[in-house]
Amino acid sequence: MLFRSFGDKCEFSGLGALTEFFSSVPQAVQERWPFDLSDKGYRTFYEQALIVSEQLGFVSRLHLRARITKGEETYAVSRKICFEDDKMVFVHDSLRREKGAAGANFAHLLMARTRDFLQAYDQIRKICYKNEHSEIFVQARSAPKGKIPVYGGYIWANQGFDFRDKSDLPRFRDRFRSFLSAHGVKITDKDLKRFTRPCHFAAFGCGIQVADDNGNGVHLGKAFMLEQTWFGRWSTENPRAEEKRYAEAYNREGIPHASRRRQAVAVLNENYKN
């Protein structure tokens, strides 16, 4: 392991940085490490494991890059993990499929393991106003027309994330209203106010389909989210939040892909029967 010091900062690099960073985390929690997917047949190759500690601010961050492979599948993952007092924060920078066909739902597998890790960690510590619930932050980025298409705006909406900053919601609703209008659909102010979480926009459908970049017909909610970039937040707090129950239904094992949205929408409808 390499150690370097730069004034009020110091760095540890190498695989030993993983052990160093999580040295205060109980072994039972470490065993749930989300990058270990060997039980699913995946192998993880770490390309960067770097701790940056700001000695004056008592901030410690682990910068992590890895490639995770299984047969013909290869995924490149980049994350930062921070300790803020006792709270742990995962900042998901990027997930890119480099090889293999779409449809493996690897994003769900990796995020589910991360949630499980944080939930196990929070169960062994005291949560209070000084030590808040652990979190995951993600930039749900979409760039469908880029050289390497990115569809995070829709993918992460189905993984239990809420908007990180609720002040962005009015602008998001305005874009949604304009998008629907362009496709001949009018929505009332009353109905639009029901859209409060990313999964609400992603789930919307009224029988109209539009072609995505691959020429496939998709429902309006998916078409809209495939063009959006937003910042998401997931917390161990309130495990039965609507967006989390939606994700649980959407990603349930054994459900055909074509039925996922229908199953998840049924969860949303439970809240709006009246």
Residue spans for each PLM region:
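Conserved acetyl-CoA binding element of GNAT-fold acetyltransferases
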Residues: A76-R79, D86-L109, Q139, Y154
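Extended, charge-biased low-complexity segments
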Residues: G7-S60, R65, T69
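Conserved active-site alpha-helix within GNAT-family acetyltransferase domains
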Residues: A140-D168
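Intrinsically disordered, low-complexity, charge-dense segments enriched in Lys/Arg
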Residues: K166-N274
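Short, small-residue-biased leader/transition segments that mark boundaries at the very start
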Residues: M1-L2
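Conserved GNAT acetyl-CoA-binding A-motif
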Residues: R125-I148
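Conserved acetyl-CoA-binding loop-helix of GNAT-fold acetyltransferases
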Residues: A101-C128
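Charge-rich, solvent-exposed alpha-helical interaction surfaces
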Residues: S5, A17, F21-S24, A28, ...
